[in-house]
């Protein structure tokens, strides 16, 4: 679990694996492990995004292969984009409309009954403010939590570290 005190900081253990750093919201760089996971996700996304003519149940089977958690009645309407998929946790009856992008370098939690309009962008990924650190390829993330029964209108952008309460309307 990420600790807000550590967002964007180097971990105390310099040998901590990059994936653990990433998930903790600490500074990390893409290494071979993360690159391989991104490659697997890219292949999964190609299958998911080719499934637009498939039935909803077939698409849900594909979605469940990679998404961290998905309650009953959820759907992602292709095309869909994400970094890993495994850090996205959706409650039940969540609908992500066309062209949603989630940069899930840390957890993105979406509550029951939440609806995304087309072109919604969820961006927990962040970058150091210090130019030298940023140019060395370091990055970090801050989790996003979206409550229950939220409606995020088309084209809305949610930035790192945001929490949206239950029943909110954004957009």
Model-derived features with residue positions:
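Short, electropositive, low-hydrophobicity segments enriched in small/polar residues
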Residues: 29, 157, 169
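C-terminal/domain-terminus segments
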Residues: 164-171
